[in-house]
């Protein structure tokens, strides 16, 4: 959330952010008008309050002097002022409520280093890693969704039967590989001095508002026990779309001490999102689904340290791919593709060679986003009331929040299935994951179960 004072004093900066981020449905002039009327009413109320205090202070003296008629006039005037003041305060409270709601619709201001652009085509590639020494791949890499079904690692048909489209079963060695990835990621980040958190899965509306998911993106989240389009209040529950929500809000409304900072938490969780994208090859399989696992990295830092921390956070997230020797690139996200809440954002995209896409690298395959690494500055902190006290005797100030996936598990799994694929249709287990799989080096798959497998010629 932007402060009222900032919006009031820098309207053109805010207007520019609205335009550059492509935010629609926001009337900044109306917000400024509400703020101006609110300030005028507050000033008028202060004047009436002062006049009433002066009138009231004379009543006792007038009575003592026997000036009963003048005393009654003062009493009547005091009551008139009280009634006027009540009307003004009620209107001011109404405007303040409107203003608070309107401020939630304003996007964060992009950092000066953010490239200007309208969409993903305008993002700037910062660097690539892992392409100088690629492993030998099969002449034709089988896409993960076909290979996963062939080896009985992924079952989309039964997932749809149980829960609907966009859900899946991860089975056998596929499930073991996913568990291995999760534990490996957590261990990597523990080495980076992250403290583990196991968060609650349902989160309330105040928490969703604190990190910026509400009110802007309510349609993308799963709501518990209510219709999606019903009005919500602070007690309503949502299935978390990312562990960023509960972990950031863990300290909501609190004041941290200067020597607490930086705070670095990591949280593994399932994540739930209604929006599953368009149908087709780009979203087929385990790439864009309604439920997926992720390790989230959340940082709370002093404002002056947040951009140095952003670069370190980027390195911490990317280290998972470095150790797995998976090729990837880092993008500096442009204003039109960076998001509503971010001041600056990097995306880490892993290379998956199984499907050739127009926006993929020259050698074929495609890019899969596995992490967005973001600095929110004090945008989330203002919404959630996250402050720190620089010195014990000083006033509290808003801290800065950052987060990034460390990483999104399904897409890393997809990249492993395609990049570590062998000519015989097996998958080599990356060396760092073998200790988590009992030393297993190769995934060969399992025999399928059921009469349908016999009919399909997949089982004798």
UniProtKB/Swiss-Prot annotation:
Q: Which reaction does it catalyse?
A: tRNA(Ser) + L-serine + ATP = L-seryl-tRNA(Ser) + AMP + diphosphate + H(+); tRNA(Sec) + L-serine + ATP = L-seryl-tRNA(Sec) + AMP + diphosphate + H(+)
Its pathway?
A: Aminoacyl-tRNA biosynthesis; selenocysteinyl-tRNA(Sec) biosynthesis; L-seryl-tRNA(Sec) from L-serine and tRNA(Sec): step 1/1
Q: Which UniProt keywords apply?
A: Aminoacyl-tRNA synthetase, ATP-binding, Cytoplasm, Ligase, Nucleotide-binding, Protein biosynthesis
The protein, known as: Serine--tRNA ligase
**What does UniProt give as the signal peptide span?**
none
Principal cellular location given in the protein's record: cytoplasm
Gene Ontology molecular function: ATP binding; serine-tRNA ligase activity
Q: How does it assemble?
A: Homodimer. The tRNA molecule binds across the dimer.
Top-rank taxon of the source lineage equals: Archaea
| InterPro entries given in the database record | aa-tRNA-synt_IIb, aa-tRNA-synth_II, aa-tRNA-synth_II/BPL/LPL, Ser-tRNA-ligase_type_1, Ser-tRNA-synth_1_N, SerRS_1_N_sf, tRNA-bd_arm
Enzyme Commission number(s) from the entry: 6.1.1.11
Q: How is this protein annotated for GO cellular component?
A: cytoplasm
Its taxonomic path starts at: Archaea, Methanobacteriati, Methanobacteriota, Stenosarchaea group, Halobacteria
Q: What is the organism field in this record?
A: Haloarcula marismortui (strain ATCC 43049 / DSM 3752 / JCM 8966 / VKM B-1809)
* Name of the coding gene: serS
